[in-house]
Amino acid sequence: MSRRRRIYEGKAKVLYEGPEPGTLIQHFKDDATAFNAKKHQVIEGKGVLNNRISEYLFQHLNDIGVPTHFIRRLNMREQLIREVEIVPLEVVVRNVAAGSLSQRLGIEEGTQLPRSIIEFYYKNDQLNDPMVSEEHITAFGWATPQEIDDIMALAIRVNDFLTGLFLGIGIRLVDFKMECGRLFENEMMRIIVADEISPDSCRLWDIKSNEKLDKDRFRRDLGGLLEAYTEVAKRLGILMENERPAGSGPVLVKS
């Protein structure tokens, strides 16, 4: 088997050259990181769950007309994606006060926000991904005003879809992070959703118990991250009740 050419390696994923021009292979690692990799642990099976959950969500977004980079799943850890030029921004959509928003503004965690709030963060680990305004984004050329409008429109559509989807399986979408990229097709360019959407990039709380089913279990040393991700996958119908993700550790089995 020929050795694949690695294009990029991040904290939780590796990108390899794809089989056709304009494609990449996105590989999900088992690494769990927080606070820009200051905290790090390998949790066996996490990459499999994130791959399958992100695949499920991106395929549904494609189906309702929200453009994403996702083409198809290749195996348990990898998916074929369209190659895009990543906009160097993290787009955070908040529905409920939590995390840094609660700390910055002194709002009690769990407080429902008056409306969904969209925030932008400059993707730069050395600077700890600082929060930026639209003025910063356009002044430094990270995105044009039209691209910002397109990104915000996508963020609202993704939020509406995810909120309803998770509500239907007893999960509250507190907030989520997404990234966008520029897809070049012939002479045209359009903004599409890229990266991943998974419990790594969302805050997901059980509606009844407020139990955290996301990466806060790792950030806050709550334990049970793999079990929480498995529970999300089961509720989405991705895993059967007693199915075990390939290469994973213990899996939650409901009594």
Curated annotation (Swiss-Prot):
Classification via CDD domains: SAICAR_synt_PurC
GO CC terms of this entry: cytosol
Catalytic activity reported: 5-amino-1-(5-phospho-D-ribosyl)imidazole-4-carboxylate + L-aspartate + ATP = (2S)-2-[5-amino-1-(5-phospho-beta-D-ribosyl)imidazole-4-carboxamido]succinate + ADP + phosphate + 2 H(+)
SUPFAM superfamilies xrefs: SAICAR synthase-like
Enzyme Commission (EC) number: 6.3.2.6
Superkingdom classification of source: Bacteria
Example GO BP: cobalamin biosynthetic process
Enzyme class: ligase
Transmembrane segments: none
InterPro entries: SAICAR_synt/ADE2_N, SAICAR_synt_PurC, SAICAR_synth, SAICAR_synthetase, SAICAR_synthetase_CS
Any one Gene Ontology molecular-function term assigned to this protein's record: ATP binding
Keywords (A to Z) from UniProt: ATP-binding, Ligase, Nucleotide-binding, Purine biosynthesis
Pathway(s) served: Purine metabolism; IMP biosynthesis via de novo pathway; 5-amino-1-(5-phospho-D-ribosyl)imidazole-4-carboxamide from 5-amino-1-(5-phospho-D-ribosyl)imidazole-4-carboxylate: step 1/2
UniProt xrefs under HAMAP family: SAICAR_synth
Family: Belongs to the SAICAR synthetase family.
Protein name as catalogued: Phosphoribosylaminoimidazole-succinocarboxamide synthase A
Organism: Bradyrhizobium diazoefficiens (strain JCM 10833 / BCRC 13528 / IAM 13628 / NBRC 14792 / USDA 110)
Gene assigned in the entry: purC1
